[in-house]
């Protein structure tokens, strides 16, 4: 499913992928919060509301599901993991892991961080300001484009 390495990503696809990468931290925080909420409720159905600035939770009656607590939690976790946001999180994590493939671990770590910073803000962090010793400019941008291409392919954008 991966596109050939010599193909450039279309501009609109590249922009979509950059926004996926830039939203990664926020989406991951939201995912972890949702996951903890599901796990902490123990499968109980509840409604959360705010009264006078104080958050309260009211548990809803579930007589027909009382014995299926674990199943309810598993179902809700599976539904959460099937969302587009979680697919994007996983795609970014997998692509980020493979940024430095074939390089010594120290250089791979530096490259991974440099590509990440460049994707977050390319104007603030161009190659010249990232000081990745041992890597040429063309190699850096090729690796960054492979990172973006892998995410695009996994998300079905290209």
Please provide the spans of the model-predicted regions.
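DNA major-groove recognition helices of helix-turn-helix
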Residues: 140-154
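N-terminal interaction/assembly modules
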Residues: 1-106, 157
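Residue-level marker of positions within ordered structural domains that often coincide
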Residues: 29, 120, 145
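Short amphipathic alpha helix immediately N-terminal
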Residues: 104-125
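Helix-turn-helix DNA-binding module
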Residues: 121-138
């Amino acid at each position: 499913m991966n596109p050939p390495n010599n193909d450039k990503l279309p501009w609109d696809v590249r922009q979509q992928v950059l926004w996926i990468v830039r939203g990664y931290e926020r989406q991951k925080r939201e995912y972890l919060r949702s996951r903890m909420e599901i796990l902490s409720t123990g499968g109980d159905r509840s409604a959360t509301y705010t009264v006078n600035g104080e958050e309260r939770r009211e548990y809803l009656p579930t007589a027909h599901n009382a014995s299926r607590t674990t199943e309810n939690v598993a179902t809700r976790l599976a539904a959460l993991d099937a969302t587009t946001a979680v697919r994007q999180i996983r795609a970014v994590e997998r692509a980020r892991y493979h940024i430095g493939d074939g390089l010594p671990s120290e250089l791979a770590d530096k490259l991974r961080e440099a590509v990440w910073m460049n994707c977050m803000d390319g104007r603030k962090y161009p190659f010249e300001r990232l000081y990745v010793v041992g890597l040429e400019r063309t190699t850096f941008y090729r690796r960054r484009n492979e990172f973006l291409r892998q995410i695009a392919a996994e998300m079905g954008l290209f």
